[in-house]
Amino acid sequence: MITLLTDFGTADYFVPAVKGVILSLNPQTTIIDITHEIPAQDIQAGAFTLGACYHNFPAGTIHLAVIDPGVGSERRPIIVATGKYFFVGPDNGIFSYVYHLEKAVRVFQVSETELFRHNSSSTFHGRDVFAPLAAWLSKGLTPENFGAEINDYIRFDLPRPQISAGKISGEIIHCKINFTCVPRVKPNFFAAESCHNATSQ
């Protein structure tokens, strides 16, 4: 199974082009759309959405995520492997929540360019680079087949709520379509701080 998460929208040919490349290489795979409505080039929004749902899928699922402002630049294509899942996309922080949530993560820089689509476009790596990588993974290739493991991958910090003068402050990290918002301050944070304060007295 391969999931797709992009900022491509659904009005143009981009999403079906990605799906067509995947199915051309592996007609037997199942493709699930997470969303294609991530705000344009909003890596943090894409990272949050992926982090909120990837673990609901069966073990072995390949998550293809493309929010890629650096397309055509020197940014690296990567494959991330955890104990249960694979992730394919650009090395730009899109997998930051995965790095934060998973205990064991291995990241591979893709150097085997012959696995890319021939005559690749410099502006459509979702179709020409990442879609073939996900398809080859679904056919049984391992991350080691694509390139060397790296440790200097890009991740952004997920700042913890701050406590000052009896107040807790934190970021709003996501607003849903029904206008409810998701704060970074979770209920268990209050419980943890209450326990900490009680034991400190």
Regions of interest found by a model, annotated:
Residues 1-40:
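N-terminal glycine-rich anion-binding loop in soluble enzyme alpha/beta folds
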Residues 6, 67, 90, 175:
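Active-site flanking residues adjacent to catalytic metal/cofactor-binding acidic residues
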Residues 7, 77-79, 107, 172-174, ...:
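Conserved hydrophobic/aromatic beta-strand scaffold that supports enzyme active sites
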Residues 8-12, 70-73, 178-179:
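Short acidic, Gly/Ser-rich segments with clustered Asp/Glu that frequently serve as metal-coordination loops
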Residues 17-21, 49-52, 97, 132-136:
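Alpha-helical scaffold segments in soluble metabolic enzymes
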Residues 25-31, 37, 42-49, 56-66, ...:
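Active-site histidine-anchored catalytic micro-motif
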Residues 119-185, 189, 193-196:
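Anionic-ligand-binding alpha/beta catalytic cores of soluble enzymes and soluble regulatory domains
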Residues 197-201:
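Short conserved beta-strand and strand-loop elements enriched in small hydrophobics
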